[in-house]
From Swiss-Prot:
Similarity comment: Belongs to the bacterial ribosomal protein bL33 family.
Gene Ontology biological process terms, A to Z: translation
Protein name (record): Large ribosomal subunit protein bL33
Key words of the record: Ribonucleoprotein, Ribosomal protein
MF GO annotations: structural constituent of ribosome
Higher taxonomy: Bacteria, Pseudomonadati, Pseudomonadota, Gammaproteobacteria, Pasteurellales
Amino acid sequence: MAAKGNREKIKLVSTAETGHFYTTTKNKRNMPEKMEIKKFDPVVRKHVIYKEAKIK
């Protein structure tokens, strides 16, 4: 069997308080800090900052 990878599933939550989120993976070894990325929020129809949150 293959070895378990370093990538962990994360959720990117919109800072516009719309409840919209994206899911993605991230390599914990290369990026130990919390991820912040600007992406499109279709609820407000603007690009806003998305912050990392844990998937429950």
